[in-house]
UniProtKB/Swiss-Prot annotation:
Superkingdom of this protein's organism: Bacteria
Key words, A-Z: ATP-binding, Chaperone, Nucleotide-binding
Protein known as: Chaperone protein HscA homolog
GO molecular function: ATP binding; ATP hydrolysis activity; ATP-dependent protein folding chaperone; unfolded protein binding
PANTHER family: HEAT SHOCK PROTEIN 70KDA (PTHR19375)
């Protein structure tokens, strides 16, 4: 049954009218902007013909600088120079402080607990900093294209959660941009390679940027890009390589940076050494009157644990996709950190084939985003290309007994809408709380709560008579909205899930692993909970029936017998013996069968009293 008709946003009213649109790779280290010109996706350079815009903003006393000019201030004024803001967006202050305690900035909490960075120009949120970077990219694009943009596609890591995605959209809107879609970075890369190389089959997209890592397993067939599975780590990237080299320098020289400026200078030297080692066998580093040499072999040893960590994530993604490594026909390398020879070597060994690097790994994401932007803005209305991303964790709802009913399973392609009908538990129930959950476990306590809302105005009916339709909808940006509607009155309530901060990828992985490790125990716990819910339902209905008709239809002995069996079920329900509860339910059913028959007869007699046969035959 079709629940939702998806229409692409921003379709041009006139097919012949060309509209200006760009793809933006909002990266941790660098950002890029691209557009389709004369049928080809190209990077738009700045005034100095530079393609990469460092994702850095400097808030000086008198002026604000973005890009390379800001990056040059990093070692001179680190407290007012914000770098790698992508790591901070959509996170809580406590999360930022625990994860990134080495950052030179001073943080304060906003009213809703999100981090604000204290600068010479006042407190700045990660959304505002990202907005300044996007404004710079917008300026470059409009200067190059000679007009105002109709829309943009912005890429995000596949593992960005709702809060991080929504924060990215908020930053774009603050910059005055019309967001056509947020697109997963690996999907954008696959789009670029799919068009240029015409490849079909299973493809792995290994994306190692400055601050994030993503792996996506995709199936490309006849213009359809389907993401079979994703995995990632929002705290793994080339920045971590730099910090490992910096730690090695400290160990070799026995000197520790004493100031934030020295720390930033050390990181810069480490980054330069990493770049040198991409093409050379060794690199010489001069630090505070000391000169040390690091070989490529030493560098490989330093980064081995991080590269291995990324490959373990690849293994999990293959398992999720139900794909063997030998089935992967091509491996696409994305992100500047994939230039490191050891990374390419290890990825090649893992998948058993040489990775594809024909498109600049720094540019491939932006180029793919530009292609999608050109389609969405209406310049390619004849395109039959379809992009299918997936939800990384199952989305469900709490039911009676603290159970989780999954509405949208993990790895379902998006956009998607799924609906399911629920009913009331008690007679006369006029409201229902919808508790939205995320995770793979069977019980509410073991899953992540995303939000709650209450549907009011349900007509009072007997338990089980009301029909409440709950619809879960995940849009193309991965944002979730939930609607509950009572079918007879059409009264409804809804919520858009917008958490204040999100899960780390380690937590996502742990949640998935936990569901496997506890599968048997979870199933037993679910069966016990379901039996308790059924016992509660039976107990409730018998108590109501006894109160209404027990004195009239039952003898004293019959009444006491039912009460005794009822009490036995209430006692056994408190235990954890599922079979004993089932036997108690059966015993109560047997004890009340005659009572139920008498109630039915009494109800029929009452309905027929005072009516003729003709009234019944011709109502």
């Amino acid at each position: 049954m079709a629940l939702l008709q998806i229409a692409e946003p921003g379709q041009a009213a006139a097919p012949h009218q060309h509209r200006l649109a760009v793809g933006i790779d909002l990266g941790t280290t660098n950002s890029l902007v691209a557009s389709v010109r004369s049928g080809q996706s190209v990077i738009l350079n700045d005034e100095q013909e530079r393609s990469l815009v460092p994702s850095v903003v400097h808030y000086g006393v008198e002026e604000k600088k973005v890009g390379l000019e800001a990056f040059e201030q990093a070692s001179l004024d680190p407290k007012n120079t914000v770098i790698s803001v992508k790591r901070l967006i959509g996170r809580s202050l406590s999360d930022v402080q625990s994860r990134y305690s080495s950052l030179p900035y001073e943080f304060v909490a906003s009213e809703n607990g999100l981090p604000l960075i204290i600068t010479a120009q006042g407190s700045k949120s990660p959304i505002e900093v990202s907005s300044d970077i996007l404004s710079r990219l917008n300026h470059i694009a409009e200067q190059r294209l000679g007009g105002e943009l109709s829309g943009v596609v912005i890429t995000v890591p596949a593992y960005f959660d709702d809060a991080q995605r929504q924060s990215t959209k908020d930053a774009a809107r603050l910059a005055g941009l019309n967001v056509l879609r947020l697109l997963n970075e690996p999907t954008a890369a696959a789009l670029a390679y799919g068009l240029d190389s015409g490849q079909e089959g299973i493809i792995a997209v290994y994306d190692l940027g400055g601050g994030t890592f993503d792996i996506s397993i995709l199936r490309l067939s006849k213009g359809i890009f389907e993401v079979l599975a994703t995995g990632g780590d929002t705290a793994l990237g080339g920045d971590d390589f730099d910090h490992l080299i910096a730690d090695w320098i400290i160990e070799q020289t026995k000197l520790k940076p004493q100031t934030a400026n020295q720390q930033r200078e050390l990181i810069t030297l480490a980054n330069q050494a990493k770049i040198t080692l991409t093409n050379e066998k060794s690199a010489v580093i001069s630090w505070q009157d000391f000169s040390v040499e690091i070989s490529r072999e030493q560098f490989n040893e330093l980064i081995y644990p991080l590269v291995k960590r990324s490959l373990l994530t690849c293994r999990r993604a293959l398992k999720d996709a139900n794909v063997e490594s030998e089935e992967v026909q091509a491996v696409v390398m994305v992100g500047g950190s994939t230039r490191v020879p050891y990374v390419r070597e290890q990825v090649g060994e893992f998948f058993g084939k040489t990775p594809l690097t024909s498109i600049d790994p720094d540019k491939v994401v932006a180029l793919g985003a530009a292609i999608q932007a050109d389609i969405l803005v209406g310049n390619k209305t004849d395109s039959d290309m379809l992009l299918l991303d997936v939800v990384p964790l199952s989305l469900g709802i709490e039911t009676m007994g603290g159970l989780v009913e999954k509405i949208i399973p993990r790895n379902t392609t998006i956009p998607v809408a799924r609906a399911q009908e629920f009913t009331t538990f008690k007679d006369g129930q006029t409201a229902m709380t919808v508790h939205v959950l995320q995770g793979e476990r069977e019980l509410v306590d073991d899953c992540r709560s995303l939000g709650r809302f209450t549907l009011r105005g349900i007509p009072p009916m007997a338990a089980g008579a009301a029909h409440i339709r709950v619809t879960y909808q995940v849009d193309a940006d991965g944002l979730l909205s939930v609607t509950a509607m009572e079918k007879s009155t059409k009264v409804q309530s809804s919520i858009q899930i917008k958490p204040s901060y999100g899960l780390t990828d380690e937590e996502v992985t742990a949640m998935i692993k936990s569901s496997f490790d506890n599968a048997q125990e979870d199933l037993q716990a679910r069966e016990l909970a379901e039996q308790r819910v059924e016992a509660d339902r039976v107990i409730e209905s018998v108590i109501v029936a006894l109160q209404a008709d027990g004195a009239e239809l039952l003898s004293t002995d019959e009444f006491h017998h039912i009460e005794t069996v009822l009490k036995q079920l209430m006692d056994v329900k408190l235990g954890s013996d599922r079979d004993a509860i089932a036997q108690g339910i059966k015993a109560l059913d047997t004890a009340t069968q005659e009572f139920a028959a008498r109630r039915m007869n009494a109800s029929i007699n009452k309905a027929l009293t005072g009516k003729n046969l003709s009234d019944i035959e011709n109502p």
